[in-house]
Amino acid sequence: MRLILLSGLLLLGIFLANGHEQDPDGKVLNSLIDALMHLQREFAKLRGAFLTVYKARSFGNGSERLYVTNKEIKNFEALRQICEQAGGHIPSPQLENQNKAFANVLERHNKEAFLVVGDSANFTNWAAGQPNKAAGTCVKADTHGSWHSASCDDNLLVVCEFYFIL
């Protein structure tokens, strides 16, 4: 959408730079201005619709972050690449409600998934006896949202985390 707006501005700039000899009544200029205003209104509607969906999804799962799966089963490195290409991140729940939203996805699919635990995390949800470095250097969550050490070579449900700064 921004590309369309920029294209409209570019056309307007070219028209203004060429002078008005070919459009003495300003019809072309007015047409370009009308088209640009229409695009701005459409962009505002699209942005509003996006924000409505985002807020509804956030409200529904009790978290400002969205956890989405493509239902594929992959190892940690493949997950990292998939999430990055999709514009998301490997899940990293920082609050209990975020972990619950993440666990809801896992429970619906009856699968485990990788997550990333930050060094300065204020929230953790390790299962009893975890972390266990002997099990691996990655972390997975079970269908209840409990965290376990895991091998990064395990193949688990692909879940990516998306959040927006508005």
UniProtKB/Swiss-Prot annotation:
GO terms under cellular component: extracellular region
Superkingdom of the organism of origin: Eukaryota
Tissue expression remark: Expressed by the liver.
Family classification: Belongs to the alpha-type phospholipase A2 inhibitor family.
Function: This phospholipase A2 inhibitor binds directly phospholipase A2 in the presence or absence of calcium.
Primary location: secreted
Keyword terms, alphabetized: Calcium, Disulfide bond, Glycoprotein, Lectin, Phospholipase A2 inhibitor, Secreted, Signal
Name listed for the protein in its UniProt record: Phospholipase A2 inhibitor
Entry-listed glycosylation sites: 61, 122
InterPro entries in the cross-refs: C-type_lectin-like, C-type_lectin-like/link_sf, C-type_lectin_CS, CTDL_fold
Cited SUPFAM superfamilies: C-type lectin-like
Disulphides: 83-160, 138-152
Organism placement in taxonomy: Eukaryota, Metazoa, Chordata, Craniata, Vertebrata
NADP found in the keyword field: no
Keyword hit for Repressor: no
Residues in C-type lectin domain copies: 46-161
Subunit structure: Homotrimer; non-covalently linked.
